[in-house]
């Protein structure tokens, strides 16, 4: 079965977060070019997802791409919004969350609004988790650690949301400005589970 049928046929998970968590590579591949990042994410997402499941991957890829050239949370989030259908359910959730971030005091209040309005979605659905990503970027744009930690504290698919926020904030700050406590543990090494000839690489060789 080829895309787009492969993302739809007998697939009750077509709007879950599985595509969104694959977005990072496309944001990295097209730094400062959110349109291209979203295009690549679309083709990837269509293999396994549909509609908002695909849009989530496009949204995050575009934000990561934009974060290489922007450092304003609202501009980065809007760059992601610009690459998905403006009236889709994901866009509505992102816009709602962005407004709550502007009008409420701190991430906890925003989390309460997200949970109140989007907590009915499954814990690994794209929409509610994307709202947490927006929250994490907004309140972490000047504090890498706070962005990741507060996103994870929001619950649901924590490893995915924390990673997405970390990718965006990492692109903003750049590797040299990330807190050492978050980078030293990697010992400058990438370990891959992909079945290729090289599974242990030092980062400078990549």
Task: Give residue spans per PLM region.
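Active-site pocket-shaping loop/turn-to-helix segments
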Residues: 50
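Short, conserved phosphate-binding/catalytic loop or strand-edge motifs used
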Residues: 36-44, 57-58, 186
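Hydrophobic, membrane-interfacing alpha helices
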Residues: 17-19, 53-55
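Alpha-helix N-cap/helix-initiation sites
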Residues: 53-54, 123, 158-162
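Well-ordered mid-protein domain cores that form the structural environment of catalytic cofactors
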Residues: 1-3
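Conserved small/polar residues in nucleotide/adenosyl-binding loops
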Residues: 199-205
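Catalytic phosphate/nucleotide-handling subdomain of diverse soluble enzymes
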Residues: 137-198
């Amino acid at each position: 079965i080829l895309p787009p049928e492969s993302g739809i046929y007998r697939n009750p998970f077509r709007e879950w977060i599985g595509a969104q968590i694959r977005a990072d590579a496309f944001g990295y591949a097209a730094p400062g070019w959110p349109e291209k990042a979203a295009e690549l994410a679309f083709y990837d997402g269509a293999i396994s997802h549909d509609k908002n499941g695909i849009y989530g991957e496009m949204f995050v890829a575009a934000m990561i791409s934009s974060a290489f050239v922007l450092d304003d949370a609202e501009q980065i989030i809007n760059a992601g919004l610009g690459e998905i259908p403006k009236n889709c359910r994901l866009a509505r959730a992102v816009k709602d969350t962005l407004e709550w971030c502007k009008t409420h005091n701190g991430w906890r209040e925003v989390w309460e609004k997200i949970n109140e309005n989007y907590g009915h979605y499954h814990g690994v659905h794209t929409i509610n988790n994307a709202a947490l990503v927006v929250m994490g970027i907004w309140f972490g744009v000047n504090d890498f650690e706070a962005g990741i930690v507060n996103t994870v504290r929001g619950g649901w698919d924590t490893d995915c949301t924390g990673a997405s926020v970390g990718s965006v904030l990492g692109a903003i700050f750049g590797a040299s400005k990330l807190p050492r406590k978050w980078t030293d543990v990697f010992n400058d090494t990438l370990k891959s589970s992909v079945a290729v000839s090289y599974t242990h690489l030092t980062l400078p060789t990549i």
